[in-house]
Amino acid sequence: MDLVALLKSHFLCHLIFCYVFIVSGLIINTIQLCTLLLWPVNKQLFRKINCRLSYCVSSQLVMLLEWWSGTECVIYTDPRAYPKYGKENAIVVLNHKFEIDFLCGWSLAERFGVLGGSKVLAKKELAYVPIIGWMWYFTEMVFCTRKWEQDRKTVSESLLHLRDYPEKYFFLIHCEGTRFTEKKHQISMQVAQAKGLPSLKHHLLPRTKGFAVTVRSLRNVVSAVYDCTLNFRNNENPTLLGVLNGKKYHADLYVRRIPLEEVPEEEDKCAAWLHKLYQEKDAFQEEYSRTGTFPETPVVPPRRPWTLVNWLFWASMLLYPFFRFVINMVSSGSSLTLASFVLVFFVASMGVRWMIGVTEIDKGSAYGNMDSKQKHSD
């Protein structure tokens, strides 16, 4: 292991990242809370401010992926569609197989300048996760319980609120509903067989109702669906902890731009369209597993410096008083003070580890693991 790799995996570096992320995140959450006063007076100003505050948080994680770990992402896409990316609102349909697929989605949004305003259809429990979840609440993310009887009205209402959103955004949706595992895949294919649908090898059966209501609610506001199929070279199994340790991954992302006019309006036809889309995604993944490449022209969108600039800003603001505080505590020589200091940072480290654990496959939700007879209907 070289010196740089050793440094990146050192606990002190992780402590610095965690400290900057937690403290800056809580400061930003506090500012976001104060901006609620603007909502009844000027809703659009509230949204623009929170869009930029959101960027200050989410871009720190993108910085870890792009600058700290140096992960490379090659996009395969139609050169005629490429100039439109970032200049229009889009629904991004991404496969859900890797622990950092959400981070790759954020990186895609960042490369095209729409990270701050981008949205996601997320499970409601994430709204209670400090910093990220609270940030999402203030930026009008769409939360769901994944029980359609409860979500039918609330999800539609949340989506309709985005029709006059003042910033460009990608609306990221994992139509599979949960991250891919072999157990979930086996159960999902039992459902596919029962419904007379073709089996998928690399994906779970997509949940069509959430996608249909998203398309219906955002039609004439969103210009296209971006069908995104993600994979990693050499059978890499990326993790958020690996990114924090500075491990470099090599991502390939196939992006197809599909005008929203081509997506049927009727729910049944929209469901059939989505099933066909996932059969095509499965074929692309199968081709990638055989050849190591996707169709279309490969392109690497340039990294923007703003994620790094943002992190350096917060680090310069927060690290000086932090180290002054540490030096003063050590100089005091008080055992009780030092013990309290160690305890606080142990708890903070465990909190960050818990947030990382939310992304881990082996600790993912049980959604999709129930018996096929007990699964909610599409």
From Swiss-Prot:
Keywords: Acyltransferase, Endoplasmic reticulum, Lipid biosynthesis, Lipid metabolism, Membrane, Phospholipid biosynthesis, Phospholipid metabolism, Transferase, Transmembrane, Transmembrane helix. Its EC number is 2.3.1.51. PANTHER family: 1-ACYL-SN-GLYCEROL-3-PHOSPHATE ACYLTRANSFERASE DELTA, 1-ACYLGLYCEROL-3-PHOSPHATE ACYLTRANSFERASE-RELATED. It comes from Bos taurus (Bovine). A motif (HXXXXD motif) lies at residues 96-101. This is 1-acyl-sn-glycerol-3-phosphate acyltransferase delta. InterPro entries: Acyltransf_C, Plipid/glycerol_acylTrfase. Belongs to the 1-acyl-sn-glycerol-3-phosphate acyltransferase family. It is found in: Endoplasmic reticulum membrane. It is a multi-pass membrane protein. It comes from the Eukaryota. Signal peptide: none annotated. Pathway: Phospholipid metabolism; CDP-diacylglycerol biosynthesis; CDP-diacylglycerol from sn-glycerol 3-phosphate: step 2/3. One of its GO terms (biological process) is CDP-diacylglycerol biosynthetic process. GO terms for molecular function: 1-acylglycerol-3-phosphate O-acyltransferase activity.
